[in-house]
Amino acid sequence: MGLDGNNGGGVWLNGGGGEREENEEGSWGRNQEDGSSQFKPMLEGDWFSSNQPHPQDLQMLQNQPDFRYFGGFPFNPNDNLLLQHSIDSSSSCSPSQAFSLDPSQQNQFLSTNNNKGCLLNVPSSANPFDNAFEFGSESGFLNQIHAPISMGFGSLTQLGNRDLSSVPDFLSARSLLAPESNNNNTMLCGGFTAPLELEGFGSPANGGFVGNRAKVLKPLEVLASSGAQPTLFQKRAAMRQSSGSKMGNSESSGMRRFSDDGDMDETGIEVSGLNYESDEINESGKAAESVQIGGGGKGKKKGMPAKNLMAERRRRKKLNDRLYMLRSVVPKISKMDRASILGDAIDYLKELLQRINDLHNELESTPPGSLPPTSSSFHPLTPTPQTLSCRVKEELCPSSLPSPKGQQARVEVRLREGRAVNIHMFCGRRPGLLLATMKALDNLGLDVQQAVISCFNGFALDVFRAEQCQEGQEILPDQIKAVLFDTAGYAGMI
């Protein structure tokens, strides 16, 4: 099997000898040079550039029992057996009898070969796509050849034109023959691929046979009529439009409102158009989106909150603080929620008003002579100036409590490192003794840093550290004792 590209047309032919069949039944791992040599004529320009095939190719085609693929079409309709319609067909598996061939004519040029491989010289047992290139065994495949290739041609002489885009009937089927692909390949019949731009058929920009890009029809964007129901493709197109518009308008639809519970309701987006549940068109007949304020789900947006949101938060915090203060004042609180706190506070105020009214009624019912004196019954919490003066006089007068019996005044003075001293003094308590003692120590030039004073059951003074502040004059312990005894009222006790 090979491609004869020396002449005007390209013909896939099967050799007559058994050696050619043995080569076709070889394994998939055959040398790549053998496989590429068979495809080399396909890449040359003479394979498809000629308008008419060579007469030798037509003679070889008629003599060969096995037909693979014919690259060019002859001008004579009698010689082109692929484009002839059969008058009668007995095949029951063909979907359309109008495009099937007569069984007697099929055996003349399309024979079934199950043992031969496809264009790549692959055995039928190892190539799962072998049936895609066997034209003679499937009558249904002949319909696929007729449908895209011979569809819309007024006469077979139009196939000689290099630019098939000028044929008006061919424009409707051009998108089916050249679908858009990422690898710039176009699927022909039976899974066979050809480059997008072929010599002689024009470039993609010029609207050639194979190189022209498929014009994507957009019937999905147009809504159906009012009486008809939308198709599945129109539904999917509307869903894509609605999803894209939702993403585009997500930033602009930020309207909010506040509820009583502090939740924030955002703008809900609802697309009106095709009703996918009941397969009916909406009454408005518009496929655009409509924004409904106050609907949709609840949520919170990221970013800085609005000013009114911050003010609302401050107001709620202040209200909660006042409620907590009211709850602390009201003695009887049944529950801790806001309604219970306010209800209990109202009940407590009513109870207080009732007690005030009862006291007023009691005062009015009692006679004036039977009232007790106010001086004995009223004891204010804060002392008046008269009571303060009485207390000061009592403090200044000698104490009625005498000193403990058998105890005499005692004063001890000890020197410490440096110029510091320790003083321990105990004597009977009398008014003004503490003030007189501190003045005496100050006159001696001693700075008291740490001291403990007790006036319970006598007067006790413990100075743990007192330093001499005057330089050049050192005070002896005996001098300190004499001054303290004299201050306590025990002169000459040393």
Curated annotation (Swiss-Prot):
InterPro entries per record: bHLH-TF_ACT-like_plant, bHLH_dom, HLH_DNA-bd_sf, TF_AMS/ICE1/BHLH6-like
Source organism: Arabidopsis thaliana
GO biological process, one term: response to freezing
Function: Transcriptional activator that regulates the cold-induced transcription of CBF/DREB1 genes. Binds specifically to the MYC recognition sites (5'-CANNTG-3') found in the CBF3/DREB1A promoter. Mediates stomatal differentiation in the epidermis probably by controlling successive roles of SPCH, MUTE, and FAMA. Functions as a dimer with SPCH during stomatal initiation.
Pfam family for this entry, one: HLH
Annotated Low complexity bias: 242-253, 364-377
Tissue expression: Widely expressed in the whole plant with high expression in leaves and stem. Broad expression within stomatal cell lineages of leaf epidermis.
Glycyl lysine isopeptide (Lys-Gly) (interchain with G-Cter in SUMO) crosslink residues: 393
All residue ranges annotated as the bHLH domain in the record: 303-352
Presence of the UniProt keyword Heme in the record: no
SUPFAM superfamilies linked: HLH, helix-loop-helix DNA-binding domain
Subunit-level organization: Homodimer. Efficient DNA binding requires dimerization with another bHLH protein. Interacts with the C-terminal part of HOS1. Heterodimers with SPCH, MUTE, and FAMA.
Null mutant phenotype: The ice1-2 scrm2-1 double mutant lacks stomata so that the epidermis only contains pavement cells.
Compositional bias annotation for Gly residues: 1-17
Keyword Transcription regulation carried by entry: yes
Region of interest (Disordered), ranges: 1-58, 240-264, 281-306, 363-384
Processing and modification events after translation: Ubiquitinated. Cold-treatment induced association with the E3 ubiquitin ligase HOS1 targets the protein for proteolysis by the ubiquitin-dependent proteasome pathway. Sumoylated at Lys-393 by SIZ1. Sumoylated ICE1 represses HOS1 and MYB15 and facilitates the positive regulation of CBF3/DREB1A-dependent cold signaling and freezing tolerance.
Gene field: SCRM
PROSITE patterns given in the database record: BHLH (PS50888)
Keyword annotations of the record: Activator, Coiled coil, Developmental protein, DNA-binding, Isopeptide bond, Nucleus, Stress response, Transcription, Transcription regulation, Ubl conjugation
Name used for this protein in its record: Transcription factor ICE1
GO CC terms: nucleus
Induction comment from the UniProt entry of this chain: By high-salt stress, cold stress and abscisic acid (ABA) treatment.
Gene3D superfamilies listed in its UniProt record: Helix-loop-helix DNA-binding domain (4.10.280.10)
